[in-house]
């Protein structure tokens, strides 16, 4: 009787060993995939304009140029002021946005443009626009789709570089 019981116990143990081993392998594979997957890039935060680089290499800083940019989970608030030949210009914007590794979209809420020597421009018309996101080496590049804005590169370091060809390159620092 003892041999039969131990033989039965061995069969039960062997029958349980395969499913347990398979389960352990699946758990290990799932954990390794989970650790290997990076969370999606987040652009949430507050940014200040550190400096603007002009085509001739000149770096313009406060007080000639100041700016702040805030991304919440779904809103963007952008303000920038600069002086050119002693005349001030500014842009203010509020928009709703979505961002992922493939697409950036915005809905205009408010836009104001005060260019030196020109009448104020206000835009509160609802408009929904999209732009492709190009991911490379941890950076996300987006041609901002509203109001002719520059191309923005969201860096892996959390900072932003915004550029308009032959006009400027703005360097934005993320605040802690």
List where the protein language model places each region.
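Short polybasic linear motifs
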Residues: 5
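Methionine residue identity
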Residues: 1-2
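Lipid interaction determinants
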Residues: 34-92, 100-176
């Amino acid at each position: 009787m003892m041999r039969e019981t131990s033989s039965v116990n061995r069969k039960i143990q062997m029958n349980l060993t395969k499913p347990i081993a398979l389960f352990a392998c699946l758990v290990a594979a799932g954990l390794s995939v989970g650790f290997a997957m990076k969370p999606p890039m987040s652009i949430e935060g507050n940014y200040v304009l550190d400096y603007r680089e002009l085509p001739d290499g000149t770096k313009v800083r406060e007080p000639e140029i100041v700016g702040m940019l805030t991304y919440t989970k779904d809103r963007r608030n952008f303000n920038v002021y600069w002086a050119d030949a002693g005349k001030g210009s500014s842009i203010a914007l509020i928009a709703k946005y979505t961002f992922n590794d493939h697409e950036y979209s915005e809905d205009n809420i408010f836009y104001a443009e005060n260019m030196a020597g020109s009448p104020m421009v206000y835009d509160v018309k609802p408009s929904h626009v999209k732009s492709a996101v190009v991911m490379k080496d941890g950076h996300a590049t987006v041609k901002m789709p509203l109001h002719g804005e520059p191309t923005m590169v969201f860096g892996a370091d959390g900072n932003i570089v915004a550029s308009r060809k032959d006009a400027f390159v703005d360097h934005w620092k993320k605040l802690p």
